[in-house]
């Protein structure tokens, strides 16, 4: 995959943007050696190639001290789960927990957090074996739309495999090729690929086009 990204970004006609829920440090460690653009922490931070990180909009993390104990409580009640603290969001991961227990605890946590967020500028987001709390109005789609306002393109392809990628699909212009990977559940994407192997074949075809 790294080779494909390098080959795609080597063509000066292309701009390759990584849109991720991961934090800046992680993406820089994994992919910082490649000439890529980044939208990270679900749209909180944007960085075009050769430029500095900028925020989608001013945010505060003052709310974290109230929400963190709730997530920690679910960690104590769910073996294998853990909390990830980013700059402007908190994430409860349960990928390593018992499947059934993890799903039950996730529903409980989501319900509790939705109640707390109803009177605040926060939103609760469910992803792939994660529950995330962050500022309202910040998501992958908002970040992608902001990026496109700076760098419009004739050909756009957006590929994602997570629930949170639906925001990106929804933010794309009508001429964009939006592709959901994996789950065949209802999606805003126009196209579907079964596995990451199919994604690699598509990327290779783009390199060779």
Show which residues each predicted segment covers.
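Short amphipathic alpha-helical segments and helix-helix/interface helices
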Residues: 2-9, 110-113, 145, 169
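Mg2+-dependent phosphoryl-transfer enzymes with acidic/Ser/Thr/Gly-rich catalytic loops
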Residues: 136, 141-209
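A structural signal for isolated positions on well-ordered beta-strands in alpha/beta enzyme cores
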Residues: 15-17, 37, 123, 157, ...
